[in-house]
Every structure is written in C-alpha cells, then in structure tokens.
Amino acid sequence: EWIIDGERFTLHGAIDDATGEVLALFFAKNECLDAYFEVLRQILVNYGIPLSVYVDKHTIFLSPKFGKLSVEDELAGKRVNDTQFGRALKELGITLIPANSPQTKGRIERLWGTLQSRLPVEFKLAGIKSIEAANAFLQKFMEVYNQKFAVSPANRESAFRELPKAVNLDHILCLKEFRKVDNSSVIRIRYFLFH
C-alpha cells in the first residue's frame, strides 16, 4: 500500500526471474484485475508473450477451488473454471504457475522492499502528486533501475515469443462472460435480463 498526496494506492508489477529486470509497474486504487491486465499489457507490448507467469494464489489469478477437486470429480469431467486473468493467459498461450510459498517469490518480494524504500523519496524529489504522474514516472524509473540492476540471463534463449501484429489485446485483456440466449432472445447476467 502506497500513499501519494494523502491517497492510498496499490502497486502492481512483474519482474523477470532470470534477469531481475522489472518488466512492468502500475499503480491503482486497489489490487484489482484491471491493474494486473495493465501489467500484462506492458509486458506484452514491450517484451512479447512470456512462456509462463509465476503468480501467488490470489483469486484474481486462481479460482478458490483451484487444486481442490477430488479424483472422482476429475474423472467425472468436472473442472475448475479459469479466472478472467487465467483465461487471458490461456488465450495467449501463457502457462500460469502458482507459487506455493512466499519464499518461492523471492525476487518480487525483494523488489517490493527496494521500491518501498526508494520510490517515496523519488516521488518527493520529482514532485509526484497524483496517481497519473506516478504511473508516468514509473516508466522512466524502470529504465534507470533495469540499467543499474538487471543481469544477463544464464540461458541466452528468450522466454518471450513475439506478439503477433494481428492480436488485439483489447479483445483478450477484458472481461468475458459466456451466456446462453433463451428462446425469446434474452440473456441473463446475474440478476439482469438483456433483450
């Protein structure tokens, strides 16, 4: 949680596990799907499609039922529905890897510690007073940070695939609801009917 000019915000981000390079950072009013979609968009546009994404077990990434189906349920063909984030990753061909303990997320946790000590000072020096200014500043900050701290990967083979020009990210990084149209051409979303 961050305070910018008296308001609280949440920082979302991603780091390359092989290099320590900060791939994306984004502030939002709270931890939310839209902010994680923005982080993913930054990665896709600037680096391409990652082969995999390592995430914690937040319900934005994984259904609360993830890993809880019995063998009988699995044999009966039942499955846990993807979250919207999980669905977007599948559409992009990205493997989602859930972290099983905080220790397995060492790099990102160390990054948060570094950012919590450095960014407030940087914001003050730059006169940052709004979330918009903070997000714009983060783009420049990442460049400087990565030049200073990122390292060469042990394996030179890229873990990113090129993002095809034909891919419209607005059609993937969005909410999608699948519904059936009834006989009177009506769909229901929760308690609402649409004609």
Where are the regions that the model predicts?
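Residue-level recognition of short loop/turn positions
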Residues: 18-19, 190
